[in-house]
Amino acid sequence: MAGRHQNRSFPLPGVQSSGQVHAFGNCSDSDILEEDAEVYELRSRGKEKVRRSTSRDRLDDIIVLTKDIQEGDTLNAIALQYCCTVADIKRVNNLISDQDFFALRSIKIPVKKFSSLTETLCPPKGRQTSRHSSVQYSSEQQEILPANDSLAYSDSAGSFLKEVDRDIEQIVKCTDNKRENLNEVVSALTAQQMRFEPDNKNTQRKDPYYGADWGIGWWTAVVIMLIVGIITPVFYLLYYEILAKVDVSHHSTVDSSHLHSKITPPSQQREMENGIVPTKGIHFSQQDDHKLYSQDSQSPAAQQET
């Protein structure tokens, strides 16, 4: 019984080198090794899971291009040219400082898969699983873009030169330079010069703002301002003064005619109604008026004498 009790006694908890604390010492060494061998992977939760998924997506969308370093190239210039950051270039090329860039002959550039830089190149086969397994294009494939640009430039330059040659041929055909004497050649050249001079003058005199002011010059604008501001008001005032004078003269003639009709005797009025011009009557009426005026002037003098 005593032996059984001794076997059932519980020893103190022991701490292993792995950092696991065992409260009971009845387990054998084989059980301990099995527990140490079992390693459980914890699931990522929250932001860590999102970060890992986004990092994997970014790695899948990135393609690494190799570029030969030339004179005058810098990290900032390459980053601006390929629309990436300097930090990404350093991370791909394992550069610690900017000075390490000058020790390289070629540099790796991370570029998005579906971008304007890679749309003319052949897409890689298969899916990328890690950063180091990204596809690197050879220098021959990278030279496709500059070769196409040079071909397009040479074609445009050749077409331009052909058009210039055609224009020169047409000018030579149009102008007849065959002359017998030097004087005729000089006269022909001077005539052509005189033709081109007025065209050049017209082009120089042309106003760059032509059309904004209906094509009028500054002097025409000044004339219009003088007409509207000075000449028009003067004519307006003169017109109204003439109208006022005409009205006054008309009223004066009407009043004089009324007075004359009151002074004329009834016999003269009858002659005027019958259509006879009363010349004598008018003379006599004037004499009668003079006599009446003289009598009226003499009457107060006679009264004073009496």
Swiss-Prot record:
Q: Which residues lie on this side of the membrane: Cytoplasmic?
A: 239-306
Which residues belong to any copy of the LysM domain?
Answer: 65-109
Q: Which residues does the entry place in the Extracellular compartment?
A: 1-217
Establish whether keyword Ribonucleoprotein is in the entry. no
Choose any GO biological process term that the UniProt entry carries and state it.
Golgi organization
Induction description: Up-regulated by Golgi stress-inducing agent nigericin.
The record's subcellular location field reads: Cell membrane; Golgi apparatus
* MF terms in GO: peptidoglycan binding
- Would you list which residues are glycosylated? N7
Q: Positions modified as Phosphoserine? A: S55
What's its membrane topology?
A: Single-pass membrane protein
One family from Pfam that matches here is LysM
Keywords attached to this entry: Cell membrane, Glycoprotein, Golgi apparatus, Membrane, Phosphoprotein, Transmembrane, Transmembrane helix
Where does this chain mainly localize?
membrane
Q: Which residues cross the membrane?
A: 218-238
Q: What does this protein do?
A: Essential for Golgi structural integrity.
- Name it: LysM and putative peptidoglycan-binding domain-containing protein 3
Specify the species.
Homo sapiens (Human)
Gene for this chain: LYSMD3
